[in-house]
């Protein structure tokens, strides 16, 4: 009971109340008038694409460069904590939680669907003179997919966690988003200005969670529909969201060392089992070759891609893909960054940056290439059918891939 009272004493009651009421109002609006919410989202999409696309692209690119460079400066040897502190979690637990925090339903949802979508249409096909659905288009499709899940996205998480970890563990400030702005606004972080900063961070995370839960609900519902032939209703999808939310809440309430650590380690073992199955059941030689060639292709193209701005007036493709991804990564930044800081106390800045960027990117690339190369091979050299599956229902793409593997059990 004393622990509960101690935790409650740290809660900002006015901010929590205001935030809760605003979230309830926003969710109520979604249920009562989803068309209005769609129009609101479409308006902001157009506004960002038309006026801020270049700015967003450059900010993410420069954040990536800065975050990676700081690891190799003298500051890289500083610890996120006192100089004699050591990490709380083992490297395996740390890596598992990092991977689980930043990659969830999205990488499963888009692992097949994204490269197959890019195989049909993307602006780089005309730039490089490649025909849709060709082998050259497959290389470009894999490259773009890796770019969207690569260094740039993870740097958006890492920089937030780095700022929070530094100011919280070395300067004694609260582990909240407002602390990252202490060098700019000083002690105003303890007043209304700080509350507004945290409020914006909460809403940013809300939008990120909305996208992730939507993708996850669609993925799980489509899987059940595909396997059992049942018709999925909106109420069923809502039930899926509620179940996932309850599991996540129980995990958080049970604490880092129990719930979240257990789920993260279980998650990474399940990922390894599924990866191994696809690797050996699929075109193994093609996958292994793609792991090498795809990674090298990404390394050679990541800088020009990071600064590429869609020159078209409508920016339809970049709005649907690159700008969507960068907005999604940034929206999750406050939450994931804070979590990264929480589990990284005692590690050096160099270890933190490399651990929160290089390791998740490497694991993510293995996943994306194993699934992506398998899907592209099935479409180009196998029975085909994935283009039609993605165009019909993007959430069923991964299940159609399993079926087309045609494993003889």
Where would I find each of the regions flagged by the language model?
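Membrane-embedded translocation segments of transport machinery
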Residues: 189, 196-347, 354, 359-409
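N-terminal alpha-helical transmembrane segments of multi-pass membrane transport
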Residues: 1-135, 253, 276
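Membrane-water interface regions at transmembrane-helix termini and the short interhelical loops
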Residues: 2-8, 36-48, 68-88, 141-148, ...
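Flexible loop linkers connecting adjacent transmembrane helices
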Residues: 2-6, 39-45, 72-91, 116-143, ...
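Alpha-helical multipass membrane-protein architecture
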Residues: 39, 72, 82, 93-97, ...
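Alpha-helical transmembrane segments of polytopic membrane proteins
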Residues: 53-61, 149-154, 237-238, 324-327
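Transmembrane-helix boundary/entry motifs in multi-pass membrane transporters
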Residues: 5-14, 49-53, 83-101, 132-134, ...
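Helix-loop-helix module between adjacent transmembrane segments
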Residues: 7-17, 21-31, 64-67, 103-107, ...
């Amino acid at each position: 009971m004393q622990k509960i009272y101690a935790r409650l004493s740290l809660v900002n009651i006015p901010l929590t109340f205001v935030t809760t009421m605003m979230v309830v109002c926003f969710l109520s609006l979604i249920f009562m008038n989803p068309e209005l919410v769609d129009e609101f989202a479409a308006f902001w999409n157009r506004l960002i694409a038309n006026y801020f696309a270049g700015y967003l692209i450059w900010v993410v690119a420069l954040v990536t460069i800065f975050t990676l460079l700081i690891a190799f400066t003298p500051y890289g040897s500083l610890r996120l904590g006192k100089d004699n502190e050591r990490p709380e979690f083992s490297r395996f637990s740390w890596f598992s939680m990092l991977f689980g925090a930043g990659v969830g339903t999205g990488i499963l949802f888009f692992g097949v669907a994204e490269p197959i979508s890019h195989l049909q249409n993307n602006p780089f096909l005309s730039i490089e003179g490649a025909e849709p659905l060709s082998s050259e288009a497959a290389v470009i499709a894999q490259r773009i997919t890796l770019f969207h899940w690569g260094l740039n996205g993870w740097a958006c998480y890492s920089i937030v966690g780095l700022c929070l970890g530094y100011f919280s563990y070395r300067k004694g400030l609260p582990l909240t988003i407002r602390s990252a702005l202490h060098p700019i606004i000083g002690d105003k972080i303890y007043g209304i200005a700080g509350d507004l900063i945290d409020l914006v961070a909460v809403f940013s995370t809300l939008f990120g969670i909305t996208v992730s839960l939507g993708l996850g609900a669609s993925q799980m519902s489509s899987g059940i529909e595909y396997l059992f032939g049942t018709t999925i209703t909106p109420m069923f999808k809502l039930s899926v969201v509620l179940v996932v939310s309850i599991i996540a809440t129980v995990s958080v309430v049970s604490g880092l060392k129990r719930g979240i650590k257990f789920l993260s380690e279980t998650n990474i073992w399940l990922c390894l089992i599924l990866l191994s199955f696809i690797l050996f059941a699929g075109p193994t030689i093609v996958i292994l070759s793609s792991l090498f060639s795809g990674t090298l292709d990404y390394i050679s193209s990541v800088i020009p891609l990071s600064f590429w701005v869609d020159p078209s007036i409508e920016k339809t493709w970049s709005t649907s893909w690159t700008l969507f991804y960068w907005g999604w990564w940034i929206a999750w930044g406050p939450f994931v960054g804070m979590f990264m800081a929480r589990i990284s106390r005692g590690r050096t800045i160099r270890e933190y940056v490399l651990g929160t960027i290089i390791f998740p990117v490497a694991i993510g690339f293995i996943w994306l290439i194993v699934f992506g190369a398998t899907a592209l091979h099935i479409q180009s050299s196998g029975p085909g059918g994935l283009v039609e599956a993605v165009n019909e229902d993007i959430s069923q793409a991964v299940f159609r891939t399993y079926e087309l593997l045609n494993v003889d059990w």
